Design a protein with these regions (language model features):
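A short coil-to-beta-strand element that immediately follows conserved catalytic motifs
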Residues: 175-180, 194-197, 236, 253-270
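Short helix-loop capping/hinge motifs at secondary-structure junctions, enriched
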Residues: 62, 189-195, 230-231, 254, ...
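Conserved N-terminal helical subregion
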Residues: 2-6, 23-25, 48-184, 228-245, ...
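Residues at the starts of beta-strands that form the adenosine-phosphate
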Residues: 5, 28, 218
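Acidic/histidine metal-binding catalytic segments
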Residues: 66-67, 121, 250-266, 325-330
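Conserved mid-domain beta->alpha element of the FAD-binding
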Residues: 7-24, 30-36, 154-155, 183, ...
Length: 405
């Protein structure tokens, strides 16, 4: 078996981004993905800071801009829909709550998939079921495909990573809940958002949000609530929807119409929010990337940047190490650890700031939002938004330059 065959588990953003740079470094890449095909749609993600630089080096920025969702900024509203605070998209140099470039997760994943498809093997509708390492390689068993051996296996399969569970240990050892649950889905409605990402808070730590999609009448909606860990079946969509409906039954603004839309949404997603912390992102010939190794939660707005930068650095270090995977993985950790540590610091107020429990807490949070562009509050949030670019991207030779697609 050649020593340059690498398996990536996960075809979201981190996995294909890693495949792109690995192929430029001369590696043979296979990606396995549980879904039967690339997943379309999803919520909007930010291209900011160093993550945007990686997309530029891949030659994909023009296409990303063409696919981006035009949003005027972020707005808070009360029960009657009256605006209580606004933050335009050009605040903080286009690096605020709504960044200069917002793109649907599925659209960004598709761009990366198309950029890697010609020279990357994809195994859809499959997953890893076993990992057995020896001194020379990793033997991987799959749910459908025949067993194969790889020089390296990378888990880029999200916070509930199968690879991490097989090679590192149970999820409870690494995923740290922040006592916040969220659901996202796409609605088609004539709700007039006027181009704004709109959020409404209700007492009890309840949040309703809606933002424009890319298509006319398309709304990316969400419900979030604070709660200690709940016992729920991640596969039982009906039970999850009923849980959300009960929590938000008496919430105002547009919650009732969005709850109705939730019942028929084809892309309903529900999960707890938690951060992933590991002392090391590798175990022998198995490594973790993106949310699988260092999920920061959506509250930080840095998950996409962490995935893109992590992919660039991991591939670059593997190419630079000349086959010494242990050296490459140590260097990957050295370069990424400070960036990840900064990114995983939640914004001021954390979950309580995002979803205040009381009416007074909501009013105080709205006041801080209205003051966000003024000193001294501006400095607090500017430091949070600046984290996206708080890493010096190494140059890894010709492969770092990318190519126009």
């Amino acid at each position: 078996m050649p020593n340059n065959e690498i398996l990536i588990c996960g075809a979201g953003i981190a996995g294909p981004a890693l495949a792109y740079w690995l192929r430029r470094g001369g590696f043979a890449v296979t990606i396995v993905e549980r879904a039967p095909a690339p997943r379309p749609g999803g919520q909007t993600v930010d291209l900011r800071g160093a993550g945007r630089t990686v997309i530029e080096r891949m030659g994909l920025m023009d296409r990303a801009r063409a696919e981006s969702v035009d949003q005027r900024g972020f707005a808070l509203v009360d029960t009657a829909g009256r605006t209580t605070a606004r933050l335009p998209a050009d605040s903080f140099g286009g690096e605020g709550i709504v960044s200069e470039i917002e793109i649907l997760r599925g659209d960004l994943a598709r761009l990366l998939y198309e950029a890697t498809l010609p020279d990357t093997e994809y195994l859809f509708d499959d997953t890893v079921t076993g990992i057995d390492q020896d001194a020379d390689a990793v033997t991987v068993t799959f749910e459908r495909a025949a067993p194969r051996r790889f020089a390296l296996v990378v888990g880029a399969d999200g916070p509930h990573s199968v690879v991490r569970g097989l090679a590192f240990g149970p999820e409870r050892d690494f995923v740290h809940p922040i006592d916040l649950y969220t659901t996202w889905f796409t609605a088609f409605d004539d709700l007039d958002l006027d181009g704004w990402f709109v959020m409404h808070n209700a007492p009890g730590g309840l949040v309703v949000s809606a933002r424009p999609g890319r298509l006319p009448g398309e709304i990316k909606a969400g419900f979030s609530f604070r709660s200690p860990p709940l016992a729920h079946d991640r596969r039982d969509v009906a039970a999850q929807q009923e849980l959300v409906a009960r929590r938000f039954a008496h919430v105002g603004w547009e919650a009732p119409r969005l709850l109705r839309a939730m019942r028929t949404a084809s892309d309903f997603f529900f999960d707890s929010m938690g951060q992933v912390h590991l002392d090391s992102w590798s175990r022998g010939r198995v490594a973790l990337l993106g949310d699988a190794g260092y999920c920061a939660t959506p509250l930080t707005g840095l998950g996409t940047s962490l995935a893109l930068v992590g992919a660039y650095v991991l591939a670059g270090e593997l190419a630079a190490a000349g086959g010494d995977h242990a050296l490459a993985l140590r260097r990957y950790d050295t370069v990424m650890r400070p960036y990840v540590s900064q990114a995983q610091q939640l914004p001021p107020g954390g979950a309580a700031g995002f979803a205040p429990s009381s009416r007074l807490g909501i009013r105080l949070r709205d006041l801080s939002m209205r003051s966000m562009t003024r000193w001294p509050v501006r400095n607090l949030f500017a430091a949070q938004f600046a984290k996206a670019g708080d890493v010096a991207l190494p140059e890894y030779g010709p492969a770092s330059a990318g190519a126009e697609q």
